[in-house]
A protein has these predicted regions:
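Eukaryotic phosphotyrosine signaling hubs
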Residues: 7-8, 93-97, 275-277
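Low-complexity, glycine/alanine/valine/leucine- and proline-rich hydrophobic stretches
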Residues: 260-263, 269-282
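Extended catalytic-interface subdomain
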Residues: 61-77, 95
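Short consensus segments that form the blades of beta-propeller domains
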Residues: 47-50, 86-90, 142, 179-181, ...
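Conserved GNAT acetyl-CoA-binding A-motif
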Residues: 8-10, 188-190
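Vicinal oxygen chelate
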Residues: 1-3, 11, 36-38, 45, ...
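Post-signal peptide N-terminal segment of secreted/secretory-pathway proteins
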Residues: 80-93, 103
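Core segments of cupin and vicinal oxygen chelate
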Residues: 2, 13-68, 192-251
């Protein structure tokens, strides 16, 4: 296999002038600076394909320690390549969003209700309750709810799904820090959306070394009302999805979607230098081109933290970052 653990970083791009504001946001979720580095515009162009001076801060949550997964990298550019994915719907080609768990979804929703309310390009989903069993059993005093409660918040700075489990647990899939204001975990899973009717996880299994996660085998979905509300789907809009993990790693998972309906293609807004969530990274055994059959736009060099790294485009059009260990 190539990856040494689950998904390492969620990479967010911002203008350099927004650094302190975004550090404060992530600090509220328990992500604190762990390392800082920089690249010149020339070196950033060579590795990331965007020619602007770059300073990056790697942010760590206490839950990252278990498997070196779920960190945040804040890339602060002198000039952005574009305005990114913003609050576009979840299921568009090229979409990304970050998932994390919480022990208090209501506290998060209360604080998100008016957060950044001065901007138009924002979306806070309703609070969605998704029973684990299908068909769902009746919820009574003697038979409490068992499932997930979820709310998604998208704006130009980022796209995050906050999820609370009820009545069950998945040990190791997100490590919640109950000392934090929002009692949340590190980033537990990442999401990508392939082109319509083009579901294919073979590349991620064969080249990344990922495998289908327990309870996450490939299946069709979209006809359940909670899923429709969470993902802003219309009746009849179905999709295929699979959850992938690094072997023996219970967190840092990758969820791969492909709609059965036509969607806009936003892959151009989903790459380094675009505002907001613009990339994901994995730690790997080798960043050599030989380890990456089938990719395009391969670039290699030292990243802003002085680590051996490469970037490339997967066959589904997604940009990825690998870091050598």
């Amino acid at each position: 296999m190539s990856v040494v653990s689950g998904l390492h970083e969620f990479v967010f791009s911002a203008h350099a002038s927004e650094r302190e504001r975004l550090l404060a946001f992530w600090s509220g979720l328990g992500f604190e600076p762990d390392a800082e580095g920089a690249l010149s515009a020339t070196d950033a162009e060579a590795l990331y394909g965007h020619g602007a001076a770059l300073t990056s801060i790697r942010l760590r949550h206490s839950g990252c320690a278990a498997h070196e997964t779920g960190l945040v990298r804040l890339q602060c550019w002198d000039d952005l390549a574009g305005e990114g994915l913003g609050a576009h719907k979840p299921l568009v080609t090229g979409s990304r969003w970050m998932g994390m768990y919480t022990a208090d979804i209501l506290e998060l929703r209360d604080s998100l209700s008016d957060f950044n309310s001065h901007i138009d390009d924002r979306w806070l989903s309703e609070l969605v309750s998704a029973p684990l069993a299908n068909p769902p059993p009746a919820v009574t005093w003697d038979s409490p709810f068992v499932g997930l409660r979820e709310t998604l918040y998208f704006d130009p700075d980022g796209r995050v799904a906050f999820i609370q489990r009820g009545g069950f647990d998945r040990p190791g899939f997100g490590t919640i820090d109950t000392s934090l204001p929002y009692k949340n975990s590190e980033g537990s899973h990442a999401n990508v959306v392939q082109a319509s009717r083009s579901f294919d996880t073979d590349f991620y299994k064969r080249v990344f070394g990922l495998e289908s996660a327990p309870y996450g085998e490939a299946h069709d979905s979209g006809d359940e009302p909670p899923t429709q509300r969470a993902l802003r789907l219309e009746a009849g809009q179905l999709f295929r999805v699979e959850r992938l993990r690094a072997p023996e790693c219970p967190t840092g998972l990758l969820q791969v979607y492909s709609p059965y309906f036509d969607t806009d293609d936003h892959r151009i807004f989903s790459q380094p230098g675009q505002r907001g969530l613009s990339a994901y990274s994995y730690r790997v055994q080798s960043v050599d081109a030989a380890a990456l059959p089938g990719v395009t736009d391969y670039r290699a060099g030292q990243n802003e933290f002085g680590e051996p790294a490469c970037t490339f485009r997967a066959p589904d059009g997604y940009s990825w970052m690998w870091i050598g260990v």
